[in-house]
Amino acid sequence: MSSYENHQALDGLTLGKSTDYRDNYDASLLQGVPRSLNRDPLGLTADNLPFHGADIWTLYELSWLNSRGLPQVAVGHVELDYTSVNLIESKSFKLYLNSFNQTRFDTWETVRQTLERDLRACAQGNVSVRLHRLDELEGQPVAHFHGTCIDDQDISIDNYQFTTDYLQHAVSGEKQVEETLVSHLLKSNCLITHQPDWGSIQIQYRGRKIDREKLLRYLVSFRHHNEFHEQCVERIFNDILRFCQPETLSVYARYTRRGGLDINPWRSNADFVPATGRLARQ
């Protein structure tokens, strides 16, 4: 259980509550969650963040009407900057997108600008939006995370409660290494509903070698942990930086979609460019 799970800032969210679905445009459906909720317990403030990054969203269920009433469909790509005051709560995002369904817009650019404006207002930060026609995406192969997968280890695990203990004394040797490690076993739970969130994670670092067994045990310990996707990624980045002290670190997770949306946060203190192709489970 997260220390802020019952924080009053979460009381007004539609997440976990019965809601009506509206199909006419309504920007008020969007709801933000202060990033400070999980950053404060980690000792992170807006002026001392040890990373840069973004939350990358893919919008698979995006439709509206053109000026003549003909339905349009697109796949949206949204990038929400890490410096925004709020993250976007995903159920409210879904409800907001549904409100486009029976609304007429003159052009695709009007839709893009509307999304960008509303998301910026909710997040209180910088947001970029791209819309893709389906033929732009057809035939694209399923992507994969570059790196060494650490999942196929012959180990026994019986603890699924979150702990940073595994990262203590998790580095060895004085030699600096540079490697990229991947796991598809990341599973956490929604902060509010406790529904499972499934993800793959890529950890790229330069520093003393990190013990792969201990790192995997740490990642598996998220299995009963309740936090939003973005919060988990920041926690993982902060914990590895704190206990393993790499010179450079990048953490990137791609989660399976829910409600027509997938969320793919990344945080880095290096020159990191995230690959945005969907993975096998997305």
From Swiss-Prot:
Gene Ontology biological process: queuosine biosynthetic process; tRNA modification
Keyword Cytoplasm: yes
Active site: residue positions: C190, D197
Localization of this protein: Cytoplasm
Positions annotated to bind NADPH: S90, K91, R258, G259
Keyword Nuclease (UniProt): no
Gene3D superfamilies given in the database record: 3.30.1130.10
Keywords, ordered alphabetically: Cytoplasm, NADP, Oxidoreductase, Queuosine biosynthesis
Binding locations of substrate: I88, E89, S90, H229, E230
Pfam families: QueF, QueF_N
Protein family per UniProt: Belongs to the GTP cyclohydrolase I family. QueF type 2 subfamily.
Protein name stated in the entry: NADPH-dependent 7-cyano-7-deazaguanine reductase
Species annotation: Salmonella schwarzengrund (strain CVM19633)
Organismal lineage: Bacteria, Pseudomonadati, Pseudomonadota, Gammaproteobacteria, Enterobacterales
